[in-house]
C-alpha cells in the first residue's frame, strides 16, 4: 500500500512538472522581431540623436536592427 501511495505522488509531481514546463515555453520565445511601429520609434529616436546610419537598434531586442531607409522613405 505504501508503494502505491508513493508511486501516485510521484506521478502527480511528474505531471505538475511537465505542465509547468509547457507554460514557460511561450514566454521565453514570445517575440523575436520588433513590429513596424517599434522600428519607426527606434529610427525616429536615432535620427533625433543625430545618427544618420540608416539602421537603428530596436528597444528590448538584443540582436535586431531596424532598416530605417525602408521605413522612413
Curated annotation (Swiss-Prot):
> Which cysteine pairs are covalently linked by disulfides here?
39-66, 43-68
Q: Where is the signal peptide?
A: 1-20
Q: Do the record's keywords include Disulfide bond?
A: yes
Q: In which tissues is it expressed?
A: Expressed by the venom gland.
User: Which compartments is it annotated to reside in?
Assistant: Secreted
According to the UniProt entry, its GO molecular function terms are: toxin activity
GO cellular component terms, alphabetically, are: extracellular region
Whether Hydrolase counts among this entry's keywords is: no
Swiss-Prot/TrEMBL keywords: Disulfide bond, Secreted, Signal, Toxin
Tree of life domain: Eukaryota
Q: What does this protein do?
A: Activity unknown, even that a lot of targets (Kv, Nav, Cav) have been tested and activities on insects and mice have been tested.
Q: What else is known?
A: Negative results: does not show antimicrobial and ion channel inhbibitory activities. Antimicrobial activity was tested against five bacteria and two fungi, including four Gram-negative bactersoia (E.coli, P.aeruginosa, A.baumannii, and K.pneumoniae), one Gram-positive bacterium (S.aureus), and the fungi C.albicans and C.neoformans (tested at 32 mg/mL).
Q: What is known of its domains?
A: Has the structural arrangement of an alpha-helix connected to a beta-sheet by disulfide bonds (CS-alpha/beta). Since the toxin contains only 2 disulfide bonds, it is called 2ds-CSalpha/beta.
Give the family, as the similarity comment puts it.
Belongs to the scoloptoxin-15 family.
Q: What is this protein called?
A: U-scoloptoxin(15)-Sm2a
Biological source species: Scolopendra morsitans
Q: What is the lineage of its organism?
A: Eukaryota, Metazoa, Ecdysozoa, Arthropoda, Myriapoda
Amino acid at each position: 500500500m505504501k508503494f502505491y501511495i508513493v508511486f501516485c505522488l510521484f506521478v502527480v509531481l511528474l505531471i505538475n512538472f511537465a505542465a509547468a514546463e509547457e507554460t514557460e515555453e511561450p514566454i521565453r520565445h514570445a517575440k523575436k522581431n520588433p513590429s513596424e511601429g517599434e522600428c519607426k520609434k527606434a529610427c525616429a529616436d536615432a535620427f533625433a540623436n543625430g545618427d544618420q546610419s540608416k539602421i537603428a537598434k530596436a528597444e528590448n531586442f538584443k540582436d535586431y536592427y531596424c532598416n530605417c531607409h525602408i521605413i522612413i522613405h
